[in-house]
Amino acid sequence: MNEHEFAQKTIAIRRKVREQRPLVHHITNFVVMNITANVTLAVGASPVMAHAHEEVKEMAAFAGALNLNIGTLTPYWIDAMVMAGKVAEQRGIPIVLDPVGSGATPLRTGAAKKILAEVGVNVIRGNASEVMSLFADKETVNIRGVDSLETVDAVRHEAGLLAGELEKVVAVTGPVDIVTDGTRTLEVHNGTPMFGRVTGTGCSATTVISCFCAVEPDLLVASAAALGYYGLAGEEAARISNGPGSFQAALLDTLYNLPEKIIQEKLRIREVLP
C-alpha cells in the first residue's frame, strides 16, 4: 500500500471501531489506568480495567482485545495476565503486550518473557530497549545506552529478527515507529516530542493499537494504522496546546475529533521493501 491507501485504511479502521465499540480489556498499571481508559473512549472503543483473579477469565472471554501492561508489577498481576491471556488465546482474541521497563530489572524482564512463553501474544509494543531486552539473554540491559545508540536501520533489523523468531507483530516506537512481522515492515513518521513530556503516552499508544486490533484482522496494518493515527493526533494536539497539561487534554480531544481530511493529508505510513 502507498501512503494514500494507508490513510484510507486508517480511516476505515477508525470507522469500524466507532461502529462496533469493541470492549478492550486492560490489565495495566496504576499510573495510566485513567488516561488509557479515556484514550480508549476517545478512539471509540469501550474500556474495562479488571485484574482480579476471580473475574479476569470471564472479562477476557467477551473482550474484543486484551491489553497487557507490566508497568506496576506484582506476582499477583503477572498471574492475572497469564490467566486472561490463555482465555483470550483460546478464543482468538488479539493480545497486545506492552513490556514497560523490560530490561530495567529482572522482575520486569522475567515477567515479559513469562507472558510471552505462556500466552499467545499477537502484538508487542515497546521502545527499542524494551524490545531488545526480550531478544537478549541478559535479564537487564543498558536502557539509556540502547535508546541513544540505536539507529532506525538497526531498530528495523532487530525488530524484524525478533518478530520472525517469535512469530508476532513487533512495534518499536521512537522518532520513527517501526512495525514488522518479520516479513513485512512498515514505518510510521507521525508523532511529536510532546509525547515525552506527559506520562502514559507510550501506554496510550498501545491502547490505540489494542482498539484497532479488535476490529482489523491484519494486525500488522492495524498496529501501524493505530500508531499513525495516534502520532498524527499528537501532532495536532501539540500545535494547539501550550504545555504538557493542555497537551494531554488536547490529545484526548484530537483523538476524538481528528478529521478524516487531516488523516488523508498528513498520515505518513510507508512500507519498507526488503
UniProtKB/Swiss-Prot annotation:
Record carries keyword Ligase: no
Family, similarity comment: Belongs to the Thz kinase family.
Function summary: Catalyzes the phosphorylation of the hydroxyl group of 4-methyl-5-beta-hydroxyethylthiazole (THZ).
Organism of this sequence: Desulfosudis oleivorans (strain DSM 6200 / JCM 39069 / Hxd3)
Catalytic activity annotation: 5-(2-hydroxyethyl)-4-methylthiazole + ATP = 4-methyl-5-(2-phosphooxyethyl)-thiazole + ADP + H(+)
SUPFAM superfamilies, per the entry: Ribokinase-like
Enzyme Commission number(s) from the entry: 2.7.1.50
Pathway it works in: Cofactor biosynthesis; thiamine diphosphate biosynthesis; 4-methyl-5-(2-phosphoethyl)-thiazole from 5-(2-hydroxyethyl)-4-methylthiazole: step 1/1
Keywords: ATP-binding, Kinase, Magnesium, Metal-binding, Nucleotide-binding, Thiamine biosynthesis, Transferase
InterPro entries in alphabetical order: Hyethyz_kinase (IPR000417), Ribokinase-like (IPR029056)
NCBIfam families listed in its UniProt record: PRK09355.1, thiM
Residues that bind ATP: R125, T173
Name the UniProt record assigns to this protein: Hydroxyethylthiazole kinase
Record bears the keyword ATP-binding: yes
Gene Ontology molecular function, alphabetical: ATP binding; hydroxyethylthiazole kinase activity; magnesium ion binding
Residues that hold substrate according to the record: M49, G200
GO BP annotations listed: thiamine biosynthetic process; thiamine diphosphate biosynthetic process
Cofactor requirements of the protein: Mg(2+)
